[in-house]
Protein backbone atom coordinates (compact mmCIF):
# COMPACT_ATOMS: atom_id res chain seq x y z
CA UNK A 1 0.00 0.00 0.00
CA UNK A 2 3.05 2.24 -0.04
CA UNK A 3 3.02 5.40 -2.11
CA UNK A 4 5.48 8.27 -2.06
CA UNK A 5 3.29 10.32 0.29
CA UNK A 6 3.65 7.66 2.98
CA UNK A 7 7.13 6.30 2.15
CA UNK A 8 8.40 7.10 5.66
CA UNK A 9 5.91 4.58 7.05
CA UNK A 10 6.77 1.59 4.83
CA UNK A 11 7.79 -0.52 7.87
CA UNK A 12 4.13 -0.44 8.94
CA UNK A 13 2.61 -1.47 5.60
CA UNK A 14 1.49 -4.94 6.81
CA UNK A 15 -0.35 -3.25 9.71
CA UNK A 16 -1.96 -0.70 7.38
CA UNK A 17 -2.98 -3.45 4.94
CA UNK A 18 -4.59 -5.79 7.50
CA UNK A 19 -6.41 -2.96 9.26
CA UNK A 20 -7.76 -1.48 6.03
CA UNK A 21 -8.90 -4.96 5.01
CA UNK A 22 -10.79 -5.22 8.31
CA UNK A 23 -12.39 -1.81 7.82
CA UNK A 24 -13.18 -2.31 4.13
CA UNK A 25 -16.49 -0.75 3.18
CA UNK A 26 -16.69 1.25 6.42
CA UNK A 27 -14.05 3.96 5.80
CA UNK A 28 -12.95 6.15 2.91
CA UNK A 29 -9.34 6.50 1.82
CA UNK A 30 -6.75 4.44 0.01
CA UNK A 31 -4.29 4.53 2.90
CA UNK A 32 -4.79 4.10 6.64
CA UNK A 33 -3.90 7.72 7.37
CA UNK A 34 -6.48 8.90 4.83
CA UNK A 35 -9.18 6.96 6.71
CA UNK A 36 -8.52 8.88 9.94
CA UNK A 37 -10.39 12.06 10.92
CA UNK A 38 -8.16 15.06 11.62
CA UNK A 39 -9.20 15.10 15.30
CA UNK A 40 -9.35 11.34 15.93
CA UNK A 41 -8.40 10.02 19.37
CA UNK A 42 -6.22 6.92 19.79
CA UNK A 43 -6.08 5.10 23.13
CA UNK A 44 -3.41 2.51 23.85
CA UNK A 45 -4.45 0.15 26.65
CA UNK A 46 -0.89 -0.98 27.39
CA UNK A 47 2.04 0.75 29.01
CA UNK A 48 5.58 1.07 27.69
CA UNK A 49 8.12 3.63 28.87
CA UNK A 50 8.04 6.62 26.55
CA UNK A 51 4.89 5.49 24.72
CA UNK A 52 1.78 7.61 25.25
CA UNK A 53 -1.48 6.16 26.50
CA UNK A 54 -3.45 8.53 24.25
CA UNK A 55 -2.84 10.50 21.07
CA UNK A 56 -5.12 13.21 19.73
CA UNK A 57 -5.21 13.97 16.02
CA UNK A 58 -4.02 12.33 12.81
CA UNK A 59 -0.89 14.50 12.64
CA UNK A 60 0.15 13.46 16.15
CA UNK A 61 -0.39 9.80 15.25
CA UNK A 62 1.72 10.20 12.12
CA UNK A 63 4.47 11.82 14.18
CA UNK A 64 4.36 8.92 16.66
CA UNK A 65 4.57 6.32 13.87
CA UNK A 66 7.18 8.19 11.81
CA UNK A 67 10.12 6.50 13.53
CA UNK A 68 8.56 3.04 13.86
CA UNK A 69 10.83 1.65 11.16
CA UNK A 70 13.87 2.58 13.24
CA UNK A 71 12.97 -0.13 15.75
CA UNK A 72 10.67 -2.62 14.01
CA UNK A 73 10.02 -3.83 10.49
CA UNK A 74 6.81 -5.74 9.85
CA UNK A 75 6.70 -8.35 7.11
CA UNK A 76 3.10 -9.59 7.37
CA UNK A 77 -0.30 -9.22 8.96
CA UNK A 78 -2.89 -12.00 9.23
CA UNK A 79 -5.48 -13.80 11.38
CA UNK A 80 -8.04 -11.07 10.73
CA UNK A 81 -11.42 -11.41 12.41
CA UNK A 82 -13.99 -8.64 12.09
CA UNK A 83 -16.77 -8.23 14.67
CA UNK A 84 -19.73 -5.91 14.27
CA UNK A 85 -20.96 -4.11 17.36
CA UNK A 86 -24.50 -3.32 18.44
CA UNK A 87 -23.45 0.27 17.79
CA UNK A 88 -23.29 0.49 13.98
CA UNK A 89 -20.47 3.04 14.23
CA UNK A 90 -18.17 0.55 16.00
CA UNK A 91 -16.11 -2.18 14.34
CA UNK A 92 -13.91 -4.52 16.38
CA UNK A 93 -10.99 -6.10 14.57
CA UNK A 94 -8.64 -8.84 15.76
CA UNK A 95 -5.42 -9.33 13.85
CA UNK A 96 -1.78 -10.31 14.13
CA UNK A 97 1.37 -8.68 12.80
CA UNK A 98 4.76 -10.30 12.29
CA UNK A 99 8.16 -8.79 11.83
CA UNK A 100 11.54 -8.22 13.38
CA UNK A 101 12.95 -5.93 16.06
CA UNK A 102 15.98 -4.19 14.62
CA UNK A 103 17.83 -3.70 17.93
CA UNK A 104 17.74 -7.38 18.90
CA UNK A 105 17.10 -9.20 15.63
CA UNK A 106 14.29 -11.00 17.47
CA UNK A 107 11.07 -11.98 15.79
CA UNK A 108 8.14 -9.75 16.63
CA UNK A 109 4.80 -11.55 16.57
CA UNK A 110 1.90 -9.79 18.20
CA UNK A 111 -1.88 -10.01 18.46
CA UNK A 112 -4.16 -7.00 18.63
CA UNK A 113 -7.77 -6.13 19.25
CA UNK A 114 -8.76 -2.69 18.04
CA UNK A 115 -12.13 -1.14 18.83
CA UNK A 116 -12.72 1.40 16.09
CA UNK A 117 -15.43 4.07 16.03
CA UNK A 118 -16.30 5.45 12.61
CA UNK A 119 -18.30 8.56 11.77
CA UNK A 120 -18.84 9.93 8.28
CA UNK A 121 -16.63 7.11 6.95
CA UNK A 122 -13.62 8.29 8.97
CA UNK A 123 -11.98 6.78 12.06
CA UNK A 124 -12.77 9.08 14.99
CA UNK A 125 -11.72 6.85 17.89
CA UNK A 126 -9.37 3.87 18.18
CA UNK A 127 -8.89 1.82 21.33
CA UNK A 128 -6.01 -0.64 21.02
CA UNK A 129 -5.19 -3.76 23.03
CA UNK A 130 -2.20 -6.00 22.36
CA UNK A 131 -0.04 -8.75 23.80
CA UNK A 132 2.34 -6.54 25.78
CA UNK A 133 4.51 -9.49 26.79
CA UNK A 134 5.17 -10.37 23.14
CA UNK A 135 6.31 -6.81 22.44
CA UNK A 136 8.43 -6.64 25.60
CA UNK A 137 10.07 -10.01 24.91
CA UNK A 138 10.93 -9.10 21.32
CA UNK A 139 12.52 -5.86 22.49
CA UNK A 140 14.35 -7.08 25.59
CA UNK A 141 14.87 -10.81 25.11
CA UNK A 142 18.17 -12.41 24.15
CA UNK A 143 19.44 -11.29 20.78
CA UNK A 144 18.64 -13.60 17.90
Predicted regions and their residues:
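Short, low-complexity N-terminal intrinsically disordered segments enriched in polar/charged residues
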Residues: 1-35, 140-144
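A beta-strand edge to alpha-helix "cap/lid" segment located at domain peripheries
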Residues: 2-6, 66-144
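Residue-level detector of alpha-helix boundaries and kinks
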Residues: 4, 17, 46-49, 101
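A solvent-exposed, acidic/Ser-Thr-rich amphipathic alpha-helical stretch
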Residues: 9, 30-89
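Intrinsic disorder/low-complexity signal
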Residues: 12, 16, 29, 38, ...
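Short, solvent-exposed loop/turn segments that connect beta-strands within catalytic domains
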Residues: 24-26, 48-49, 89, 103-105
Amino acid sequence: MTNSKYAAFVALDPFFDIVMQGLAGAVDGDHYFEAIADDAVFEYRYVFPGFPSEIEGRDALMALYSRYGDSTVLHSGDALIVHRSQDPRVVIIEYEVHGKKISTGNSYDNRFISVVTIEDRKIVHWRDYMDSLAAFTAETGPRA
